């Protein structure tokens, strides 16, 4: 569960950390194993919302190898396409084939290690003696790969309708409504009994901050009969 937006009202709002600062902290904590250059933005979302790095795991205890060491950042973004996560696709298959060929042509220890790990992954995904189900293949891929996602949620102070309109992460309802997650966190979460012992009222104040009404004034919205806010998300009008 993510507590952001108005539900983060009890946190020190002056203690913000930017996406760049998070990436620098990761680089420092990993002692350079991961750098800013190993992260890419997610194409299906606004560029300020997500940064992701994929790592090839060494099951013998060696350091993980970021995908950007054998795939360009542009190729990795292209393989992500219109999804938040890497999924099997012809584009990803071709990219990995190209990466294997380039690694094979190199003559250094790290390239050889990356080749060895990729070979292990391929053997697990495509064993010679049997076919594997899609579920088995997914589990094998998850075992040999890790992803680090940095997600910059919005709250009332940095609420940006341009980012909201490009959102690809939404709460979905039976009537087909999709509410971008940051819009839900800011406008709805603290008014639902399942999340709040004492749900707040629209327009109520907390330490001088108006809940929801300031944000609603920023966006052009259409309301359905239940009063729930409908905001556009990427790919929908």
Task: Give the ranges of each region predicted by the language model.
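Conserved C-terminal portion of the radical SAM core fold
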Residues: 1-39, 43-46, 60-62, 176
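A short, glycine/Asx- and small/polar-enriched loop/turn
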Residues: 47-51
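Radical SAM enzyme core and accessory elements
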Residues: 56-237
């Amino acid at each position: 569960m993510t507590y952001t937006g108005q539900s983060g009202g009890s946190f020190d709002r002056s203690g913000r950390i930017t996406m760049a600062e998070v990436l620098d902290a990761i680089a420092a904590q990993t002692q350079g194993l991961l750098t800013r250059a190993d992260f890419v933005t997610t194409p299906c979302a606004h560029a300020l919302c997500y940064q992701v790095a994929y790592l090839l795991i060494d099951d013998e205890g060696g350091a993980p190898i970021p995908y950007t060491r054998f795939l360009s950042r542009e190729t990795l973004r292209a393989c992500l396409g219109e999804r938040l996560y890497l999924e099997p696709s012809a584009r990803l298959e071709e990219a990995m084939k190209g990466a294997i060929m380039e690694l094979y042509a190199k003559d250094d220890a790290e390239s050889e290690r990356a080749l060895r790990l990729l070979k292990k992954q391929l053997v697990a995904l495509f064993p010679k003696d049997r076919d594997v189900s899609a579920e088995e293949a997914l589990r094998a891929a998850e075992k040999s790969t890790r992803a680090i996602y940095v997600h910059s949620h919005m709250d009332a102070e940095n609420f940006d309708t341009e980012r909201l309109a490009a959102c690809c992460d939404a709460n979905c309802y039976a009537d087909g409504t999709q509410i971008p997650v940051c819009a839900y966190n800011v406008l709805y979460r603290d008014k639902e009994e399942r999340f709040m012992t004492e749900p707040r009222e629209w327009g109520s104040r907390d330490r001088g901050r108006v809940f929801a009404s300031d944000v609603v004034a920023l966006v052009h919205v259409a309301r359905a009969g239940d009063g729930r806010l409908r905001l556009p998300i990427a790919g929908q009008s």
